[in-house]
């Protein structure tokens, strides 16, 4: 039973570790659903993090239907993760019909070598989550991150529970999207899942001397993983 934290900065990754997370999913652009992190962020986090590090591989926002050039970008990013000694990668690719893009996934998983693989929330916008789950198992993925095809894991609790039953011991189903200390126990009871995914973020005040009078989207407050929020979720998961 444990918590994976989605982190989009060095500070967030270290806060996740300090709060007791079992694993970090490192990404960039978390407010846009997450993208592949920068090389610098990845390298520094890898140097400083002691818990397992998985890296989101997603070259752009939008759907999960990728052309050949985008798959090649992703493959090279996966290779970078291998070179830096990451523990795993977080992948997902669909075809235009909403099914798993098996050739793309096989190419990426081959590039990952011995790294672990999580199939991400592409399952939630697929045509058939149950079929995607079977494909993820066949591909050798360790886990699937899902909100149960809803905006939040709490809303998708019934679908997540069905996926947990379908998966059995073959693969881990990890609820994510809106997971917090306020709902993690309900999600645990309602789904039977054993690991959960959250960003556990809180606001960080801008250090700029004064707000700009005309520009509000640059240089302001931002969100960062909060040690106390992580610890609260972890403690609830450790409660019998």
Curated annotation (Swiss-Prot):
Gene Ontology CC terms: cytoplasm
Gene name tied to this protein: cutC
SUPFAM superfamilies: CutC-like (SSF110395)
InterPro entries documented for this protein: CutC-like, CutC-like_dom_sf
Main location: cytoplasm
Family the UniProt entry places it in: Belongs to the CutC family.
Residue runs in coiled coils: none
Protein name: PF03932 family protein CutC
HAMAP family referenced in this protein's UniProt entry, alphabetically: CutC
One GO molecular-function entry: copper ion binding
Tree of life domain: Bacteria
Alphabetical keyword list: Cytoplasm
Protein's cellular compartments: Cytoplasm
